[in-house]
Amino acid sequence: MKADIHPQYHLIKVVMTDGTEFQTRSTYGEEGATLNLDIDPKTHPAWTGGTQQLLDRGGRLSRFNSRFGNLSFGKK
């Protein structure tokens, strides 16, 4: 393998949406950094079987709905 081409791999703390914390190794941030999750396996509809909840981050969802909310895509 070539030297000095791979990102640093170190321990970080991951905080899930319910406050549960665990440590894992990652290339994210620096040693000891904290990664706060917005969506995790306990809340994601693909894993829970629930309906999808859309979070409006920075008004993007509102802007999309204002531009394309009146389209029907074949629904009558």
Curated annotation (Swiss-Prot):
One of its GO terms (biological process) is translation. Disulfide bonds: none annotated. Keywords: Ribonucleoprotein, Ribosomal protein, RNA-binding, rRNA-binding. Transmembrane segments: none annotated. GO terms for molecular function: rRNA binding; structural constituent of ribosome. One of its GO terms (cellular component) is ribonucleoprotein complex. The keyword Ribonucleoprotein applies. Binds the 23S rRNA. Belongs to the bacterial ribosomal protein bL31 family. Type A subfamily. NCBIfam families: L31, PRK00528.1. Part of the 50S ribosomal subunit. This is Large ribosomal subunit protein bL31. It comes from Beijerinckia indica subsp. indica (strain ATCC 9039 / DSM 1715 / NCIMB 8712). The lineage of its organism: Bacteria, Pseudomonadati, Pseudomonadota, Alphaproteobacteria, Hyphomicrobiales.
